[in-house]
Amino acid sequence: MYCSMPDGEVENKLQDVIDRKILDTRRVFFSEPVTDKSAADAIKKLWYLELTNPGQPIVFVINSPGGSVDAGFAVWDQIKMMTSPVTTVVTGLAASMGSVLSLCAAPGRRFATPHSRIMIHQPSIGGPITGQATDLDIHAREILKTKKRIVDVYVEATGQPREVIEKAIDRDMWMTADEAKDFGLLDGILFSFNDL
């Protein structure tokens, strides 16, 4: 008797096996925009690794165009609370909130692959903005607070003066991995995971 599974089930089972194998190596891949869902998925995986083997290193691989600041800082805060040392590795792209996530590792643990790109900029509000003047003023003050938090992260991570960071993020600032290293966003360029 022959029993076949629908293609979707086969793909899902294969994806589960791949995800399990990767998690067994204590690697978490974040290869999507930063959303509430992607942040929650990453946090669950990170905490699974933390709880199953506390204090053992975790590699957080980032390839993200950025996205939600709040969701990104949720991941950031969780990583900072763990006992397991986290190493970040940018591969492909870490833009906007993705670049902030790449800095959640302790100094000496922030890397990128040779052809990666990093983009930093100030936060923005998407879509048309409508509402009463008072509400718009509240939103404007909130985005300025968010900008300050992001500037604080970049200043602490890079050691650059606040004025340099504020000027750098005034518009999109694109960097190669080497340029990001020179700017202080990375500690090194990673040519092999064996180098970790």
UniProtKB/Swiss-Prot annotation:
Alphabetized UniProt keyword annotations: Cytoplasm, Hydrolase, Protease, Serine protease
Q: Which one of the record's GO molecular function terms can you name? A: serine-type endopeptidase activity
Residues of the active site are S96 (nucleophile), H121
One GO term describing the cellular component: cytoplasm
Superkingdom field: Bacteria
Q: Which PROSITE patterns match?
A: CLP_PROTEASE_HIS
Does the keyword field hold Protease? yes
Q: Name one Pfam family in it.
A: CLP_protease
Places the protein is found: Cytoplasm
EC category name:
hydrolase
Its primary localisation, in coarse terms, equals cytoplasm
Catalyses: Hydrolysis of proteins to small peptides in the presence of ATP and magnesium. alpha-casein is the usual test substrate. In the absence of ATP, only oligopeptides shorter than five residues are hydrolyzed (such as succinyl-Leu-Tyr-|-NHMec, and Leu-Tyr-Leu-|-Tyr-Trp, in which cleavage of the -Tyr-|-Leu- and -Tyr-|-Trp bonds also occurs)
Q: What InterPro entries does the record tag this protein with?
A: ClpP, ClpP/crotonase-like_dom_sf, ClpP/TepA, ClpP_His_AS
Query: Per the UniProt entry, what is one GO biological process?
Result: protein quality control for misfolded or incompletely synthesized proteins
Enzyme Commission no:
3.4.21.92
Keyword Cytoplasm belongs to the record = yes
What does the subunit comment say?
A: Fourteen ClpP subunits assemble into 2 heptameric rings which stack back to back to give a disk-like structure with a central cavity, resembling the structure of eukaryotic proteasomes.
Q: Which family does it belong to?
A: Belongs to the peptidase S14 family.
PANTHER family assigned: ATP-DEPENDENT CLP PROTEASE PROTEOLYTIC SUBUNIT, ATP-DEPENDENT CLP PROTEASE PROTEOLYTIC SUBUNIT, MITOCHONDRIAL
What's its job? Answer: Cleaves peptides in various proteins in a process that requires ATP hydrolysis. Has a chymotrypsin-like activity. Plays a major role in the degradation of misfolded proteins.
Name of the protein in its database record: ATP-dependent Clp protease proteolytic subunit 2
Q: What is the lineage of its organism?
A: Bacteria, Pseudomonadati, Chlamydiota, Chlamydiia, Chlamydiales
Gene for this chain: clpP2
